[in-house]
Each structure stands twice: as structure tokens, then as C-alpha cells.
Amino acid sequence: MTQEERIAKLNELYKQAASLNEEFPAQLMEKLSIYGQILELLGGMWAAATKDWKLAEAKRRETIATVYSLDPEGTTKDREMKGEMAAAEWRRKEAEYEAEALRWKAAYVATQEQIQILKKKYEHMKEVAKGGI
């Protein structure tokens, strides 16, 4: 499944979840199930973004090492600077991919929290139905 397909599926699942009334236990349970599916997709997006981030980091390090080792001219500091300049594009990509990974991680954690809130709400409903508080 491509990223665009995953995002479309996420949007569809969020719409389904939003259409359910949390005041009815059956719909609340259905919403929990949908949030579980959302969590699974978010985990995949987080993993894919983390992979892109780490691959960009590896490419940046490889570029620096290659330039440093293949250019014997200049001082050590000059060679390091040349390596960093050659790897500047990879450093930018690394930052973009890191931001994307953190975005998906935040969405994942927020969804976990939402699931916990819904579970507490369901438990409260059960207690009220039994005559408790």
C-alpha cells in the first residue's frame, strides 16, 4: 500500500469514527475497533518515515566519508568542511524525514491516548449501567 493509499484509508477511518455516537456502548466499541485500525496504519507510516530518515542519515554520512577520504588536499578541517558541503542536501532531506517521522509518531501516541480515553469511558458506562457512579 502506497503512502497516498494509507492516507486515504486513514481519512476514511477517521470519518467512520467521527460518525459514531460515543454515548451508545455498541458504537463506542466500534469506534475503539476503528481506532485500532488507525493505530495500525499510523504505526506503518511512522516506521516508513523512520526508515527514510535513517537512510538519509546513512547517505549523508557516506557522502561525508567519501569526500573526506578521496580528497587528500587541505587540512583536516578543510576536508571535513568539503564533506559537509557535499552532504548538505542529504542533511536537509534527513531533517525533513525526521520531521515526518516525528509527525507520525505524535499521531500514533495521540491515537493511543484517544483509545485509552474511550476505554475509560466504556468502563464508566458499564459501572453506571450496574448502578454505580
Language-model regions: role of each:
Residues 54-96:
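Extended, amphipathic alpha-helical coiled-coil scaffold segments used for oligomerization/tethering
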Residues 62, 92-125:
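Long amphipathic alpha-helical coiled-coil segments
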Residues 10-17, 28, 64, 77, ...:
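Generic structural signal of hydrophobic/aromatic residues within well-ordered alpha-helices
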Residues 1-5, 9:
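Extended assembly-interface/linker segments at domain junctions
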Residues 30-65:
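Short, well-structured hydrophobic secondary-structure segments
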Residues 11-42:
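Short, charge-rich amphipathic alpha-helices with coiled-coil/heptad character
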Residues 1, 127-133:
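Short acidic DE-rich linear segments
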